[in-house]
């Protein structure tokens, strides 16, 4: 599991989502699986179901398209079964989360939307910079988020 995968999974968990990580789906008769779903999260209150494929690759967009078409296709096929018994929505918000690249020419990929690490960090810091550590410290079970909260609180010192 890479750093980006940990961060996006913990961010969703922190916000009240039930999160599944590294889920193998489509068991093959001869062994192995059709695909691995990196992060799948469901928020029962918001009725939001999201499938995130984080990557720090520097591959071409053609190669990424091929990879994410397969990954998101498997997600649409198998994700509803992961939350059997829960009232999950039919529509799955599928996000290719990249640490490297630009979405200027590629806002969508493999049937999902492109999100950059900078977008994720903006979302996280917009929320955490409003929460003082003294009153609303992020729980120790979210060390990456807690570190970001500390950085937000001390951003004036860090900006030197």
Where are these regions (language model features)?
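Intrinsically disordered, low-complexity Ser/Thr/Pro/Gly-rich regulatory segments
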Residues: 1-160
